Amino acid sequence: MKIVGISCSPRKGKTTRTSLDKCMGAITENFPEIQTEIIDLAGMDLRGCIACGHCMKNLECSQKDDFNDIIPILQDPDLGGLIIATPVYLGTMSSQCKAFLDRTVMFRRNGFLFRDVVGGVMAVGGFRNGGQEATILHVQSAMLVHDMILVGDGKPGSHFGGTMWSGHPEGIEKDDPGLKTVESLGHRVAQVALKIHG
């Protein structure tokens, strides 16, 4: 089984990717039987959906950009979990995240291929209470349209997902409360994915 993480920041190697690395690391450390992969959208040519309908017939997009390289990874029948990590921009997800989610409509149109895939979301904000939970809910709404199974960060907090603060004076790696939520999110996605997909 495989769990894929998507880093939706336009900035390569920054706080969103660091947070996702921690989340995916918790999976690798605690569930060695699960394969993990991270797709970093930073620097990719990823355009928004143009609603042309081309993908209604097959898993192919009419736009010739980097999303076409992502399709084979996401259509893998071993996909058991999908974790989306996004920065908070003006109280919601990044434009890269929105473009990515809109383009995944092809998986819905071709037999709901994400049905029963376990979904988790994490958001990185510039303030401790900087819109992370609202952003997570926005991403989760797209996952629900795919008929995915959503989980939060589990015990002990059991909230919407991973919530990180990029404004910590000593760097995001010192955001201990936030790190606990992203590590717990990874653990929870893996735990539920194993129960469903074995």
Give, region by region, the residue ranges found by the protein language model.
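N-terminal beta1-alpha1-beta2 submodule of the flavodoxin-like/Rossmannoid cofactor-binding fold
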Residues: 1-110, 156-198
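Short, glycine-/small-residue-rich phosphate/pyrophosphate-handling segment
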Residues: 95-96, 109-160
